[in-house]
C-alpha cells in the first residue's frame, strides 16, 4: 500500500500515546472549550451592585389584551318599561323626520289616522288613563 494513503486515513488514537497531531483529539478539545460569550457571565459577581436602585431597571410589560366576550354571554341592558303605548312610540318615531316647527301638526295628523277602533278595539293597547273608546 502506498504510504500517502496512510496520511489520508487518520484513525483515532484511543488514548494510546501522546499524539498531538491527531485531528480527532483536537476537535474534541475545541468542543470542550467554553463558549466565548460565557466568559462575562462566569466573571460576573454573585450579587448585583448595592448602590443602584433596582426599581430603575424594572421593565414594564405591555398591557395584556382584555378578554373578548362573546355576544352570547353578555347581558343586554335592561330597558325600563315606561307607560308609553306602542301608538305613542310609533308616533314619536314618525315625527323625527318632520321639521321641528311642524312636529306638533304632524303628531296630531298621525294620531288622528292611527288611533281608531280598527287598530285598538275597545282601547286595547292604549294606556289606561286614556279611557275607553
Swiss-Prot record:
<keyword id="KW-0217">Developmental protein</keyword>
<keyword id="KW-0744">Spermatogenesis</keyword>
<feature type="region of interest" description="Disordered">
    <location>
        <begin position="12"/>
        <end position="57"/>
    </location>
</feature>
<keyword id="KW-0325">Glycoprotein</keyword>
<keyword id="KW-0221">Differentiation</keyword>
<comment type="function">
    <text>Post-meiotically transcribed gene that has a role in late spermiogenesis; required for actin cone progression during spermatid individualization.</text>
</comment>
<dbReference type="GO" id="GO:0007291">
    <property type="term" value="P:sperm individualization"/>
</dbReference>
<feature type="compositionally biased region" description="Polar residues">
    <location>
        <begin position="16"/>
        <end position="26"/>
    </location>
</feature>
<feature type="glycosylation site" description="N-linked (GlcNAc...) asparagine">
    <location>
        <position position="83"/>
    </location>
</feature>
<protein>
    <recommendedName>
        <fullName>Male-specific protein scotti</fullName>
    </recommendedName>
</protein>
<comment type="similarity">
    <text>Belongs to the male-specific scotti family.</text>
</comment>
<dbReference type="InterPro" id="IPR031397">
    <property type="entry name" value="Soti"/>
</dbReference>
<dbReference type="Pfam" id="PF17079">
    <property type="entry name" value="SOTI"/>
</dbReference>
Amino acid at each position: 500500500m502506498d504510504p500517502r494513503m496512510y496520511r489520508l486515513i487518520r484513525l483515532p488514537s484511543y488514548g494510546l500515546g501522546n499524539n498531538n497531531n491527531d485531528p480527532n483529539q483536537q476537535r474534541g478539545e475545541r468542543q470542550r472549550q467554553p463558549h466565548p460569550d460565557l466568559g462575562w457571565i462566569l466573571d460576573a459577581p454573585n450579587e448585583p451592585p448595592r448602590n443602584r436602585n433596582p426599581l430603575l431597571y424594572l421593565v414594564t410589560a405591555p398591557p395584556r389584551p382584555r378578554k373578548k366576550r362573546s355576544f352570547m354571554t353578555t347581558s343586554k341592558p335592561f330597558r325600563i318599561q315606561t307607560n308609553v303605548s306602542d301608538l305613542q312610540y310609533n308616533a314619536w318615531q314618525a315625527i323625527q323626520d318632520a321639521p321641528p316647527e311642524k312636529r306638533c301638526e304632524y303628531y296630531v295628523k298621525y294620531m288622528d289616522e292611527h288611533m281608531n277602533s280598527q287598530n285598538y278595539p275597545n282601547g286595547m293597547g292604549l294606556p289606561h288613563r286614556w279611557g275607553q273608546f
